[in-house]
Amino acid sequence: MERIKELRNLMSQSRTREILTKTTVDHMAIIKKYTSGRQEKNPSLRMKWMMAMKYPITADKRITEMVPERNEQGQTLWSKMSDAGSDRVMVSPLAVTWWNRNGPMTSTVHYPKVYKTYFDKVERLKHGTFGPVHFRNQVKIRRRVDINPGHADLSAKEAQDVIMEVVFPNEVGARILTSESQLTITKEKKEELQDCKISPLMVAYMLERELVRKTRFLPVAGGTSSVYIEVLHLTQGTCWEQMYTPGGEVRNDDVDQSLIIAARNIVRRAAVSADPLASLLEMCHSTQIGGTRMVDILRQNPTEEQAVDICKAAMGLRISSSFSFGGFTFKRTSGSSIKREEEVLTGNLQTLKIRVHEGYEEFTMVGKRATAIIRKATRRLVQLIVSGRDEQSIAEAIIVAMVFSQEDCMIKAVRGDLNFVNRANQRLNPMHQLLRHFQKDAKVLFQNWGIEHIDNVMGMIGVLPDMTPSTEMSMRGIRVSKMGVDEYSSTERVVVSIDRFLRVRDQRGNVLLSPEEVSETQGTEKLTITYSSSMMWEINGPESVLVNTYQWIIRNWETVKIQWSQNPTMLYNKMEFEPFQSLVPKAIRGQYSGFVRTLFQQMRDVLGTFDTTQIIKLLPFAAAPPKQSRMQFSSLTVNVRGSGMRILVRGNSPVFNYNKTTKRLTILGKDAGTLIEDPDEGTSGVESAVLRGFLILGKEDRRYGPALSINELSNLAKGEKANVLIGQGDVVLVMKRKRDSSILTDSQTATKRIRMAIN
């Protein structure tokens, strides 16, 4: 208290006030400010002042032997005085000019390799086309964008390890190169940069540009891929835009684009399967994008999109804490709420159970073509300020906000029943029911909302129920603004959980994402997406399912054959046969399955009736739950090419055609690969040749484990016994001979012994 009184007393004297406000500060403080610390306080002044001196540069002593004292014009290039405090020479800027013109030439072979990002940029600009300049108001919103075209997607730590390994291989320090991409890049760069004379620091800096994604939070009105961002200063100002088409694409943009397409396809497909989460993981792990495993890309790529984030959540990765509704990203900026279940009645007197958010909250809403600020109380929209590219985009944002508000007049505006279903034919949750309903037709919603007189506010304008702008009236609480709303800038990621049905929740239990939020937009991927999972075979239609199913059987024939004879039920239940079922007419699936299973059982029972091509051809039909009936079929129908096509049980058809001489299988006229029939089909006694070096001991003996295929026999040690599957699907017990001398006689005895063992 005493101190404060003293200060007040001092301040009351006018002289004190004058001293503190008018006089210059003690000079020592200023000197300190500009001399303490290594950081240059006024770099441009320092530069101008230095360059005004005669010899502002210092160089190594060796320079005096390589650069003459004077140039052709007689100007002095370096001083005989040495630099104070070091053993370097003082040099004039003219020496640099001389060096650039007359200095030694080094090999330039490494320049395009080290400065690759710059050379590539020049190429893109050279081939790019600049269109006309348009003058108009630019609605820019800040988005997190990639500013560095042509980079790989390594984390800073991974890149650091690669750079150290490439540039300073002998430096001490633990470096762990684990990921596929790290190893590939390291190998590639080491080869490229052999005998490179460019300074290691420069090489390291340029490598970093090539390996790491750099993002900035920038105001953007147009394209956000990195090849547009690198020319942002040329394409959009405050009141103008210049049309531009990039002169080349870069892999990082292609990866981002293809990743989104793959993720959307996978989430859509997983949502309709019996166990969506397991299916999604299986597909993510077996998919490649441009030759890189999708899971590796997901771990490194920061793209935020609904489907991509669902895949990341499934893999246990952190994602952004914002949530998605109606294709917009919502981020709460203030307020809080508690959730409570409430039953409401629609205009059609249908009861809906909705989770009401009680409390005042503010959100930003960011979509592809519109953005908004929304303020809401319990089941009431207080204010919505929206901006967008066009009337349509603004309307979409308004509908989403109105549904999100959960207002009663919105629920009462429902006409007709709400019974929207998702791809798996399950009813959507009430909020998405409402959203779908009004996205189809929002006329009643807008009419019933109510309108109000508005004040004239700079940059804001009203909007009427028919979406026409107005300066006098507007739909209640809703205004259109010229200014966009910035995207949420934080890169913070949170731990989330995901349930079986792919609903992603934060740790408080709020739903952030669900499959309903995944866009239905179809696009063509820039990079090849290879879905190895059988679940994705149907993405290219029924023909692809047919070809892929048969190719899978042929590729795995050795194991399929063993399962066919020993554990058929397990084989019939394989998920690879699931897509095929959609091609078989529903009414007859069960009968086909029963018929084929019976046929296969006869093949197992009756010697000499094993038929490779027939098993392969009919196997997919046996996967459906069988119906027992006495029906026999000579052909089976599959729905491809828009109609039913027949597969003949015995013999070839346009759908399934096997050429015995060429051993090629064609499905619907497309080559499906080589099919090697079992040796004994048609020619007896050949299996003996296969079994040379083995002694046949008799019938199958279960104590020696499951039957091996003939290929697997080579792994047996001498004297070891094993069951083996021979041609007809029969299993015999064999022993690998202890001596090689007797191999010749095996061929003759084998044939007899097989006959005996089987009979």
Curated annotation (Swiss-Prot):
Coiled coil: none
Motif window: Nuclear localization signal: 736-739
Record-annotated disulphide pairs: none
Primary subcellular site in the record, as a coarse category: virion
Entry annotated with the keyword Cytoplasm: no
Subcellular location as annotated: Virion; Host nucleus; Host mitochondrion
GO cellular component, one term: host cell mitochondrion
A GO molecular-function descriptor: RNA-directed RNA polymerase activity
Site positions (Mammalian adaptation): 627
Biological processes, Gene Ontology terms: 7-methylguanosine mRNA capping; cap snatching; DNA-templated transcription; symbiont-mediated suppression of host cytoplasmic pattern recognition receptor signaling pathway via inhibition of MAVS activity; symbiont-mediated suppression of host gene expression; symbiont-mediated suppression of host mRNA transcription via inhibition of RNA polymerase II activity; viral RNA genome replication
Keywords, in A-Z order: Cap snatching, Eukaryotic host gene expression shutoff by virus, Eukaryotic host transcription shutoff by virus, Host gene expression shutoff by virus, Host mitochondrion, Host nucleus, Host-virus interaction, Inhibition of host innate immune response by virus, Inhibition of host MAVS by virus, Inhibition of host RLR pathway by virus, Inhibition of host RNA polymerase II by virus, mRNA capping, mRNA processing, Viral immunoevasion, Viral transcription, Virion
Protein purpose: Plays an essential role in transcription initiation and cap-stealing mechanism, in which cellular capped pre-mRNAs are used to generate primers for viral transcription. Recognizes and binds the 7-methylguanosine-containing cap of the target pre-RNA which is subsequently cleaved after 10-13 nucleotides by the viral protein PA. Plays a role in the initiation of the viral genome replication and modulates the activity of the ribonucleoprotein (RNP) complex.
Quaternary structure note: Influenza RNA polymerase is composed of three subunits: PB1, PB2 and PA. Interacts (via N-terminus) with PB1 (via C-terminus). Interacts with nucleoprotein NP (via N-terminus). Interacts (via N-terminus) with host MAVS (via N-terminus); this interaction inhibits host innate immune response.
Family, similarity comment: Belongs to the influenza viruses PB2 family.
Protein name: Polymerase basic protein 2
Organism, as annotated: Influenza A virus (strain A/Qu/7/1970 H3N2)
